Amino acid sequence: ARQPGQDTGSFRAAIRAIGQRCDVVIQTSTGGAVGMPIAERCGPLQLTGSDAPEMATLNVGTINFGDDIFVNRRQDTMQVAQRIAAAGLVPEVELYDLGHLDIAHELLDKGRLQLPLHVQFVLGVRGALAASKRNLELLVERMQDFPGSSWGVAGVGRHQLPMAELAAALGGNIRVGLEDNIYIEKGVLAEGSAPLVERAAKICQASGRKVASATEARKILLTRPVAVAP
């Protein structure tokens, strides 16, 4: 398998190919891979014009990641938040543990983020917060500290389906796809992310939730201030 990369050329090609096929909100990662330097992780933030994303992820805390360590030092998080703001993008705040909510508060206090936020709970990483109903309910309760903010949940591996169902029931948004889970059912590889998205849409419909169009998704995710880069 190829090693993960954050080079602008690969992201530019992917964004153009996606744009030719469908209308979706484009979000790029600043997480990269374990051990990747911050400068490399921020590569996609250099894209401009029609090649630029609309959102970028912001990882706010260090966690154990299996047998590795996913390092997000305080000063690095501040730097990435500043670069996202300078690019005029909306951040998606990635939270892998309960204490990451407090780091998000610090970023708000320092003006590196502005309310309302869009928060993504990533649950089930071995070494971080477990994917359980109790944990998600606690996180959702803490969202009261971020007035007007939206949230979603990504369950890693076998946790993707139950977390998607729980998010729909609790009024949140759902993240699915091959980044977090490669199986459509036990032992059966998914033929791309599309089947996982289709399943998530059915979960929403079964819960009485409307699946957002691209236009509606932009209103939900992008109608918020961009933090001013100091």
Give residue spans per PLM region.
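Glycine/small-residue-rich loop that forms an oxyanion/phosphate-binding "nest" at active or ligand-binding sites
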Residues: 33-50, 54, 58, 62-67
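Short, electropositive alpha-helical surface patch
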Residues: 5-22, 42-55, 105-119, 174-175, ...
